């Protein structure tokens, strides 16, 4: 990444709230409770219920786990679009989500897009990063 890109990423807020078409949307890196907390599709519903109580949002969009999912728990939609580049679910294809909102309906569609992983691997090798990073990109898994 360029220094400008690194600087931009480092200065992003850890959370943000937006209101759109009558929906209260919270954007978080990790969870609403902790930006370092991993939320996965197999995280217990009990944990999602705990978060739903305090979040004051209709939609919670997270990242951090790099794992795509959509759960609707206690009136709150929990969505993770996945990751464009470094997946953790065993599929190296990039992942994103398209969220369609109307006043009374929310529809989430997840998409996977293959990309040339070997081009990324070549760049990683140029940077002399440990071999585990090459393995992670090729396997689409978190290995560290």
Predicted regions and their residues:
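Acidic, metal-binding active-site segment of PIN/NYN-like and related structure-specific nucleases
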Residues: 60-66
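Short, acidic/polar N-cap/turn motifs at the starts of alpha helices
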Residues: 13-17, 67-68, 96
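Short active-site segment of divalent metal-dependent hydrolases/proteases
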Residues: 32, 67, 85
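Divalent metal-coordination and catalytic microenvironments
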Residues: 9, 29, 64, 82, ...
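Acidic, His/Gly-rich catalytic cores of divalent-metal-dependent hydrolytic chemistry
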Residues: 59, 72-144
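Conserved catalytic scaffold of divalent metal-dependent phosphoesterases
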Residues: 1-59
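Short secondary-structure capping/turn micro-motifs that flank functional sites
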Residues: 25, 68-69, 140
